[in-house]
Amino acid sequence: GYHFDAHKLGQFLRDWATERGVLHRLLKATDVEQGTQAEIAALLCEDGTRIEGDIFVDCSGFRSVIAQQTLGAQFIPFGENLFNDRAVVLPSRHSTRFKPQTDSIAMRAGWRWSIPLTTRVGNGYVYSSKYVSDEDAEAELREAIGMQDEGEARILEMRVGRIAETWTGNCLAAGLSQGFIEPLEATALHIVIATALDFADAYEKGGYGSGHRDMFNQRIAAKYEGIRDYIVAHYRLNQRSDTQYWRDNAANDALSDNLKGMITAWFTHEDLREVNLRQHDGNPHYASMSWHALFAGYGTFPPEAKTVPTPTGLVTAEVDHTRRTLSACATNFLRYAPLSD
């Protein structure tokens, strides 16, 4: 994965696209003009500009102005098993030690991230408003990062779920307008890229043909549900009991059949790879290795597996040799440290 400044990335992509002929205009759309029931004729802008098009990409965020508000795309909420619906964010300065990784740390009613960038550290606390107020969540984050009085925090509301059909008529919803799964696995950009690539492929094959459109919508929906299952498992398998938030997550039985199948397979010694491939027609979002890491990482082993003695004759890891090899590889790269002022 990469650490990047989302604002600067947007500027870079804008410049990259315009240099290659993409027309970039800053206009405020105030209304949507419909043609047929399931198609858009034009966007009407504040300055009187009327923008016609063959395909309209709805990137209007959680408002989903075209897909949901105009075309009536159905929204499917995920609140029954993904409780978090808020985030409080607050950047901080680098400490003396510069970390080359994102930290994800459990909190009383959710979890927080710490992401090092070259000029600052991004911090955020993802939580459920059912279990903690905005004020208390901000106070908890400030205490955790040692910024009780510095900086201005922002509260972000999250609408967690997806629309039933990402491609409706001549509108493609992308980003927050098509759906959002909380950022625990940082999957938002992946879904946007997959949506763009799959749409281009489907459109080139069949234009507005309903067959290709239906298959595209099914693939995107399956991707959302596959990611959802994996993230829900993080909460369902937790073994904390210090707050009601974590107790309710551990007791939550609103699980999909696929997730129940993966948990059952793990505890009954089935082949996770076979089960995973079968559930997703050979194309799962998370490989079986990821599921192994998740289950084992939570220490959720079948009871008998905990008492089985370690087999003899196993090859022991040559830790010192591995450490020397990695150190030698590191000499090929610049030292990972913040840019000097």
Which residues make up each language-model segment?
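Long, low-complexity C-terminal extensions of enzymes
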Residues: 201-341
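FAD/FMN-dependent oxidoreductases across multiple families
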Residues: 118, 127-239
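Generic, low-specificity signal for short hydrophobic/alpha-helical stretches with a mild N-terminal bias
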Residues: 96, 123, 153-159, 174-181, ...
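Tryptophan-centric aromatic hotspots in well-structured domains and transmembrane helices
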Residues: 2, 55, 111, 167, ...
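Short, surface-exposed, charged/polar-biased interaction segments
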Residues: 34, 77-78, 83, 109, ...
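Short conserved micro-motifs at the rims of enzyme active sites and ligand-binding pockets
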Residues: 100-101, 126, 183-186, 305-306
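A residue-identity detector for tryptophan
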Residues: 16, 111-113, 167, 246, ...
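Predominantly flavin-linked oxidoreductase catalytic cores and closely associated redox partners
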Residues: 1-143, 196
